[in-house]
Amino acid sequence: MQFRPSIALVLSIVGILSLEISWTDGCTCFMETRREKCQRSTFGFIGYPYFAGRTNIGGMEYNRFCFFIVRIHKGLSVVFGEPCVYSSVSSAACGTGFYSGSLSIVNGYIESGVKQVNLCGWNERWRSVPSFVKFMFLTQPNWCYA
């Protein structure tokens, strides 16, 4: 009879450890406001995603998202070229995505010459942004600058 509780104990410990391991492998972002995320970014724009595909850059798989850009709010020279951004395929590496045809705000950074976005940046559907944040963002030219 004492054998069964020890098996249950071992199984519960293994279960807890596996859960802990899976949490440490996931994406971890700092708790930041939308403004702080925007200030931390190298470039930013509002646009409609019209193309999504996969590509390989330097041996890494990325999702590629191209946009019809409506408004550039940061990094004009960066955004003015190819209207596409790249995000890791893996959500464990903080990969993100966009809804095709849905107006989105996109903020990212340059790494190894590639425009990258991730879950830790301010990247979301424009309609999900609270009205007050939209008002501050659209009326204060330096809102995204520290």
From Swiss-Prot:
Keywords in alphabetical order: Secreted, Signal
InterPro entries noted in UniProt: TIMP-like_OB-fold (IPR008993)
Membrane-spanning parts: none
Signal as UniProt keyword: yes
Cleavable signal peptide: 1-26
Keyword Ribosomal protein among UniProt keywords: no
Official protein name in the record: Uncharacterized shell protein 1
